[in-house]
């Protein structure tokens, strides 16, 4: 018994460094019907990220709100994904994500645009570290579905390096250069 408590103490000592920011997206009161009546509890939905290209989400259920949030945060940290960002501020290309009846469309944006996204999507982009993006949610407005659809779309994003590697080319061959549109206009 003493050893078990000792291990717990060690776990608390190495508690996470504040490298991750977290955002509580939704909290619901849930109930379970049992023989004697209803037992109430809470479900929390949390998004966690390092604001430098990693993001994850988690949900937790417990009898008390703080415990539900703690469980959701732990699950979110275990489900982190890495997303390549262009110039550390926006997406490389337009993407679409789906989950259930939810559909999310995310588009790149020029500097200064800001995060134009609703509710749960905004939390994901802020925790990811995106500064300029335009996003639209269609279909299900359920926060769980919106976050899962957003994460699904972000998993599909490919950096120019990944695309070049798959095609067996160099990054410079894939990215459009700035002088080509001018040359095309002169020739026309």
Curated annotation (Swiss-Prot):
Cellular compartments per GO CC: small ribosomal subunit
Top-level taxon: Bacteria
Any single Pfam family the record assigns to this protein: Ribosomal_S5
InterPro entries attached to this UniProt entry: Ribosomal_Su5_D2-typ_SF (IPR020568), Ribosomal_uS5 (IPR000851), Ribosomal_uS5_bac-type (IPR005712), Ribosomal_uS5_C (IPR005324), Ribosomal_uS5_N (IPR013810), Ribosomal_uS5_N_CS (IPR018192), Ribsml_uS5_D2-typ_fold_subgr (IPR014721)
Annotated stretches, region: Disordered: 158-188
Keyword terms: Ribonucleoprotein, Ribosomal protein, RNA-binding, rRNA-binding
Molecular function GO terms recorded: rRNA binding; structural constituent of ribosome
Record bears the keyword Ribonucleoprotein: yes
Parts of the chain that traverse the membrane: none
Domain (S5 DRBM) ranges: 20-83
Keyword DNA repair: no
An annotated GO BP: translation
Function per UniProt: With S4 and S12 plays an important role in translational accuracy. Located at the back of the 30S subunit body where it stabilizes the conformation of the head with respect to the body.
Protein family membership: Belongs to the universal ribosomal protein uS5 family.
Free-text domain note: The N-terminal domain interacts with the head of the 30S subunit; the C-terminal domain interacts with the body and contacts protein S4. The interaction surface between S4 and S5 is involved in control of translational fidelity.
PANTHER family: MITOCHONDRIAL RIBOSOMAL PROTEIN S5 (PTHR48277:SF1)
Assembly and oligomerization: Part of the 30S ribosomal subunit. Contacts proteins S4 and S8.
Protein name stated in the entry: Small ribosomal subunit protein uS5
Native source organism of the sequence: Paracoccus denitrificans (strain Pd 1222)
Gene that specifies this protein: rpsE
């Amino acid at each position: 018994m003493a050893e078990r408590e000792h291990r717990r103490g060690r776990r608390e000592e190495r508690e996470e460094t504040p490298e991750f920011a977290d955002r509580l997206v939704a909290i619901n009161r849930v109930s379970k019907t049992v023989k004697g009546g209803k037992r109430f509890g809470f479900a929390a939905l949390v998004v966690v990220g390092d604001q430098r290209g990693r993001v994850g989400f988690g949900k937790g259920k417990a009898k008390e709100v703080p415990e539900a949030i703690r469980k959701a945060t732990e699950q979110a940290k275990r489900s982190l994904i890495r997303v390549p960002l262009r110039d550390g501020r926006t997406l490389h290309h337009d993407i679409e994500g789906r989950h259930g009846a939810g559909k999310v469309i995310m588009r790149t944006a020029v500097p200064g645009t800001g995060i134009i996204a609703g509710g749960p999507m905004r939390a994901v982009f802020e925790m990811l570290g995106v500064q300029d993006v335009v996003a639209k949610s269609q279909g299900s407005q359920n926060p769980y579905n919106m976050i899962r659809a957003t994460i699904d779309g972000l998993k599909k994003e490919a950096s120019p390096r990944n695309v070049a590697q798959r095609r067996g080319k160099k990054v410079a061959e894939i990215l459009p250069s700035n002088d080509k549109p001018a040359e095309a206009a002169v020739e026309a």
